Amino acid sequence: MKQKNIDEMYMRRCLQLAKNGRLLAKPNPMVGAVIVSSDGNIIGEGYHVRYGEGHAEVNAFRSVRPKDENLLCEATIYVSLEPCSHYGKTPPCADLIVRKGIRRMVCGCVDPFSAVQGRGIEHIRKAGIDVTVGVLEHECLMLNREFIVRNTENRPYILLKWAQTANGFIGYSHITSDIKATLQISNAVTKMLVHKLRAEYDAILVGRNTEELEHPRLTVREWNGKNPQKIVLSSTYKNNGFVDEVLYVNSLQQLIETINQRNNTEQKICSLIVEGGAHTLQSFIDAGLWDEIRIETAPFTISNGIAAPHLPNNIDIVKKEFYGNTIVTYKRL
């Protein structure tokens, strides 16, 4: 097997391990690490389990059995994200790798965090360790897209999400229709998937009309996980701030500024779902404030209603799923 294929095989294992930290590692990135002996056996592996605790590299070295310690000098460590080179809540992982005397390091992608940005790789190379960077780089970046966007765009990763009928309506018109009930588009399975999605995001936003007409709880009820921070956006609000644990903001600019201020505390918002309504969703699209769009389409139609937002031109389909309703996920080109 070629070295490139070997490196990709072990990096896929790193990615597999990293995903175990999806809920508890935040706001840190998900990272996996695998230590492979010179004869191709995995002698240690780990992932970043929880924010404030040991990183993936630390846990991988801890898992190495005492009888295998002597193999480290000829071993390769695979890491899905560049090892940190600064003191935070834990010591630098780059220092640990150097101290352990590893022969080679394979890194999936460079860490965009301002305190790292290649410094970990440089430190390890200066110690005489052979370093390869960029193995499965796209997959490694996509795994931590929320972390990447926060550190490169200075804002949270933003997912726009709505459900629509087959003819493109997201709800009944409250002006032209006598129907006062909420239009039920999602089915039992897709509702569960919505709650799973909420558990993975830090905050969820709706506009004033949706808040006043539907009073959505926006909580995680059909999946295990922490409730996201509820945010309501309306230009009619004079003041920004919290009321009964709900964050109210009056503009997109104020939203980003408030979130960035909050990110200086322990209650960071690294990812945001925007659920509507149509005017609110369109305002994010028009402002270019989005990274992913997720549309659920039911097979039925209604004669009249509130039209779904217009999709931007710079999009590409990531995946299509079918659960009775069709879910299409788009990303920015």
Predicted regions and their residues:
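Short Asp/Glu-rich motifs
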Residues: 116-117, 142-144, 217, 303
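Helix-turn-helix
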Residues: 32
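Enzymes that bind and transform nitrogen-containing heteroaromatic metabolites
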Residues: 2-28, 44-45, 68-71, 89, ...
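Hydrophobic, well-ordered secondary-structure segments
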Residues: 121, 137, 141-144, 191-194, ...
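Zn2+-dependent cytidine deaminase-like catalytic core
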Residues: 35-139, 283-285
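Active-site beta-strand termini and strand-to-loop segments that position acidic
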Residues: 37, 151-153, 331-333
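Short, hinge-like loop/turn segments at secondary-structure boundaries
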Residues: 122-126, 149-151, 221-224, 310-312
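Flexible, polar/acidic helix-loop-strand segments at domain edges
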Residues: 144-155
